[in-house]
């Protein structure tokens, strides 16, 4: 099951996150009752405060770990001002998969290992958090051949012991 992306709308004071919780909490419970797991993919808006709390913290509190997991996106955590490794640790046990996406100067997506995210820490925390899948995701290759970018990301991961 999926729900399209919605961004943080400061004009609405984050009201749509309240709406999301109200609408999707029963959905998450129904999925759980039927042996499925509801997943949430973050962007940068979840690292803004709404009513004095980061949205991602509120989501983690409102949905129990057995109701909703997170597909943490390392790039968007960093764009939002967070530390991806720290958030992997905070959401431990709720991250069956994470999106590996590197961050380059100027808010650009980069090949894994060529930006400024400390992936050695990310890998360490992901292992401790019980993450089973780390998925390379580079939405924008900034004019480069996407297959070349994928190969360089793959080579970086292999250099860190992943096959």
Identify the residue ranges that each predicted region occupies.
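Active-site acidic/histidine proton-transfer and metal-coordination neighborhood
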Residues: 1-69, 147-148
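Histidine-acidic metal/acid-base catalytic patches
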Residues: 37, 50-72, 76-163
